[in-house]
């Protein structure tokens, strides 16, 4: 496992803390346009992901990339997470990874 450039676990609210840094987020795809995907974060905020994932897209995607603004990620890696995903648990993971247990996450 490459730990030289870790990606912070983020939801919509946490994204603004990491502008210019590598992040990972799970989104529910709302729509896909040329060069971007519009999605809903696990805390119900809209996120724009720049880039073009390989079709077909599933309902949930994990995106790893650089946070450009408080609601935009420039994607480097896209991973289909299927059509069913526990967004509440992932949202809690984001809170833990950015809170008192941050030291446990790369």
Curated annotation (Swiss-Prot):
GO terms for cellular component: nuclear lumen. SUPFAM superfamilies: Nucleic acid-binding proteins (SSF50249). GO terms for molecular function: DNA binding. The modification N-acetylmethionine is found at residue 1. The keyword DNA damage applies. Pfam families: Rep_fac-A_3. GO terms for biological process: DNA recombination; DNA repair; DNA replication. Belongs to the replication factor A protein 3 family. Component of the heterotrimeric canonical replication protein A complex (RPA). As part of the replication protein A (RPA/RP-A), a single-stranded DNA-binding heterotrimeric complex, may play an essential role in DNA replication, recombination and repair. Binds and stabilizes single-stranded DNA intermediates, preventing complementary DNA reannealing and recruiting different proteins involved in DNA metabolism. This is Replication protein A 14 kDa subunit B. It comes from Arabidopsis thaliana (Mouse-ear cress).
